[in-house]
């Protein structure tokens, strides 16, 4: 409710009070002050999942993967942080600078309120507001009130300075991943400003008590266990803190395997994931269950054996560990995240590129379960395996002693993101190279030009050239 009642003439200031009240499906913050401007944007339904993934990558100093940032990726997308800052008026820039650290605290699980009080004051003269009549008029109750002309003029002046559309756009452009918890499409104003004002007489208006409120997505808000209603401006620190904890755990997994060779690292990551979680059959059996659950990646690293995942969690966790391990412009191993179908059922898996060759990897189907059963590819029949077929018709994996499984790529979520070089698969299973020390020495002598003995000309990485790259590949294989 907007209250513009001023009791008395001197030092007339509205009092701002903040109360939280439960309402159907959400919580409203009621402010005994002026409801100023607001802004919202339209986003894909699963955008919050992409932003959370981006935040997990950002926490460990990495750029988000292509499946997060490419707009063609089936809706599960987000933009990379912008590098160019649009021009804002000094007051709005001050608001922006105050909000950024508060947003970062919430993202890290350290902030429990998304209603931020600002230490900002504005003063307007009657002339600046363009008011021709009296600012204060006596009402039927005998009290003085701001005139309608004055109220409209103040609202216009404040909104020109506190441009919510500009503020929201700049926050989303420069801190997209840290705003994974923010409900940017909330219909009643994802970001809103409240304020109060008063006057010292008939010539000057003082505006203050500014509060910026940012709506919290239901996935990350404090929720009443009995009613399942949630508080719109109360982040649940247990939920928002889970992202930082998961990122730290994943980094620890990588650190613990740092001294191993490439193949041994991949095996260790597979074993970690399959021990950390089981397949969530309850979720998988839910009709039309969509990709984009923001918790799938976190569940693998939360240390809780009651939180399990579907294929999305297995494959994204494996890619995350690979991306944390192999960085730079020319990584030894690259992990991709295709979506499509497995024998006609929606599925997500991995492609691992190692030594310039791509191998199908399905961690989901390499798992065993607490009840003693196991997936069709347990323990490693669908790990860096061979597959026959092609990009358009799909690839078939022959599981010895069982059956053949057909994988097909999704046009929008996979073929539009990756090219054929990344989707063409090896027909044979990856085999770790095994060499002895004499072969390593012989190849080193050949690569260095010390000898021309062709018996040492081993094309280790299968690139058609005998070079120092083969020496590197052989050395790496010796520690795998």
Regions found by a protein language model. Give the residues of each.
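Cellulosome-associated attachment modules in secreted, modular CAZymes
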Residues: 20-25, 431-480
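Intrinsically disordered, low-complexity N-terminal segments that are enriched in acidic
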Residues: 26-217
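Secondary-structure boundary elements
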Residues: 234-303
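Active-site nucleophilic cysteine motif
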Residues: 269, 293, 306-322
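Hydrophobic/aromatic-rich core segments of domains that either
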Residues: 312-393
């Amino acid at each position: 409710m907007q209250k513009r009642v001023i009791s008395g003439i001197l030092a007339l200031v509205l009092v701002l009070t903040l109360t939280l009240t439960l309402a159907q499906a959400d919580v409203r913050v009621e402010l005994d002050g002026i409801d100023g401007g607001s802004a919202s944007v339209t986003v894909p339904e699963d955008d919050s999942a992409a932003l959370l993934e981006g935040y997990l990558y950002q926490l460990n100093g990495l750029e988000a993967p292509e499946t997060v940032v490419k707009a063609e990726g089936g809706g599960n997308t987000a933009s990379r942080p912008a590098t160019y800052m649009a021009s804002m008026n000094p007051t709005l820039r001050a608001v922006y600078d105050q909000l950024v650290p508060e947003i970062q605290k919430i993202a890290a699980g350290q902030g429990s309120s998304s209603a931020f009080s600002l230490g900002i004051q504005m003063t307007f003269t009657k002339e600046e507001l363009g008011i021709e009549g009296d600012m204060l008029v006596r009402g039927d109750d005998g009290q003085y009130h701001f005139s309608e002309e004055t109220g409209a003029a103040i609202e216009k002046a404040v909104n020109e300075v506190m441009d919510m559309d500009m503020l929201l756009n700049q926050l989303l452009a420069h801190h997209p991943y840290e705003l994974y918890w923010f409900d940017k499409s909330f219909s009643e104003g994802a970001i809103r400003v409240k304020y109060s004002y008063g006057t010292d007489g008939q010539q000057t208006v003082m505006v203050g008590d500014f509060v910026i409120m940012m709506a919290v997505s239901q996935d990350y808000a404090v929720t009443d266990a009995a009613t399942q209603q949630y508080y719109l401006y109360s982040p649940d620190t247990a939920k928002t803190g889970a992202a930082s904890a998961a990122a730290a755990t994943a980094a620890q997994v990588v650190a613990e395997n740092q001294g191993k060779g490439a193949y041994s690292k991949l095996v260790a990551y597979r074993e970690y994931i399959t021990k950390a979680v089981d397949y969530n059959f309850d979720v998988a059996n839910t009709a039309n269950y969509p990709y984009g659950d923001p918790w799938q990646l976190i569940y693998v690293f939360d240390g809780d054996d009651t939180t399990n995942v579907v294929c999305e969690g297995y494959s994204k966790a494996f890619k995350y560990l690979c991306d944390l391990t192999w960085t730079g412009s020319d990584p030894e191993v690259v992990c991709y995240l295709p979506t499509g179908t497995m024998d006609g059922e929606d599925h997500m898996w991995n492609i691992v590129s190692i030594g310039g060759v791509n191998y199908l990897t399905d961690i989901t189907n390499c798992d065993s379960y607490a009840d003693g059963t196991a997936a069709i590819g347990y323990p490693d029949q669908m790990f860096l395996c061979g597959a026959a077929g092609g990009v358009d018709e799909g690839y078939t994996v022959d599981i010895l002693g069982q059956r053949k499984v057909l994988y097909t790529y999704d046009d929008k979520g996979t073929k539009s993101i990756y090219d054929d070089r990344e989707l063409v698969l090896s027909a044979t299973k990856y085999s770790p190279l095994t060499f002895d020390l004499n072969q390593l020495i012989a190849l080193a002598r050949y690569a260095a030009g010390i000898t021309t003995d062709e018996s040492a000309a081993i094309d280790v990485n299968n690139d058609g050239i005998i070079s120092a790259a083969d020496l590197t590949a052989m050395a790496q294989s010796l520690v795998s």
